[in-house]
Amino acid sequence: MLFLLLCNNLYYIPIQALFKKGSTMKLITAVIKPFKLDEVREGLAEVGITGLTMTEVKGFGRQKGHTELYRGAEYVVDFLPKLKVEAIVDDELVESTIDTIIKCAKTGKIGDGKIWVTTIDQVIRIRTGESGKEAV
């Protein structure tokens, strides 16, 4: 919330009123299988996504872990290697971004990953101080 003092009168302005409707940005986060990264990156470039952040992560879900044999001994691997891919996109690109990630990352097997969407309040480019869409 924002309070504004004008001519000795205090006004309350909902923070949403400062943004034009539809001008918000979203953080699309996807956890995918590592070998699908190039396909996902190329697909996102085709729909206009110009920047990504990628982090190597480990996790498990329904896929659980698996047993590996190393030098004659069995080891249980509980956390499986995945990649977390993140992109900040304008509202208009959210659905095409999600559709592209699904199309490019899907193998049809357990462990294909997850996608979630988070609202971004503000983005600032450190070098120039630009903010909002211009910073993406």
Located regions from the model:
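Positively charged, small/polar-rich N-terminal and surface patches that mediate targeting and assembly
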Residues: 2-136
